[in-house]
Amino acid sequence: MTNGNGAPPEAAQAPQLNVLAQYTKDLSFENPNAPASLAPQAQQPSINIQINVTANTLADSEFEVTLAIEGKADNAGSLIFSFELLYAGVFRILNVPKENLHPLVMIECPRLLFPFAREIIATAVRDGGFPPLMLDPVDFVGLYRQNMERQAAAAASADEAKPS
């Protein structure tokens, strides 16, 4: 038995995640102390990376997910380089229960975007005169949980601050 398009009925209800587009929204690389920053350093620089994920609903089943990655490298308080990347994708998600949709958008979609963003950053840092910066894999499940806990704590403190 089929559902009219040749597929069995259970296949019509299978969850689907499609990448419709991927693109760089913003890319910035700064090497403010060049050429001095390109000289061999006595010690390894300190590298600080911040990652954030945001999502916007475009249509009933389409979402734009943006992976924001910012980084700075400094040595003894002197900025060596900094970068900022906003890398986004448009995803179509079908046949996913509503309670699973938010985690899917905020975990799986950025996980699919990350390798591309990682390559863009490695190339930008290399083109800035430094060895490529290979970002470690990101635990998007842990990042999602941290953000949910932070939102819950903010909501709880907002409720406590309301006058009775």
From Swiss-Prot:
InterPro entries to which the protein is assigned, alphabetical: SecB, SecB-like_sf
Organism: Rhodopseudomonas palustris (strain BisB18)
GO biological process, one term: protein folding
Full protein name: Protein-export protein SecB
Gene name per UniProt: secB
Cellular location(s): Cytoplasm
Keyword Transmembrane helix annotated: no
Subunit record text: Homotetramer, a dimer of dimers. One homotetramer interacts with 1 SecA dimer.
Role according to the record: One of the proteins required for the normal export of preproteins out of the cell cytoplasm. It is a molecular chaperone that binds to a subset of precursor proteins, maintaining them in a translocation-competent state. It also specifically binds to its receptor SecA.
GO MF: unfolded protein binding
Top-level taxon of the source organism: Bacteria
Coiled-coil stretches noted in the UniProt entry, renumbered to this chain: none
HAMAP family: SecB
Alphabetical keyword list: Chaperone, Cytoplasm, Protein transport, Translocation, Transport
CC annotations in GO: cytoplasm
Statement: the UniProt record of this protein carries the keyword Protein transport: yes
Family of the protein in this entry: Belongs to the SecB family.
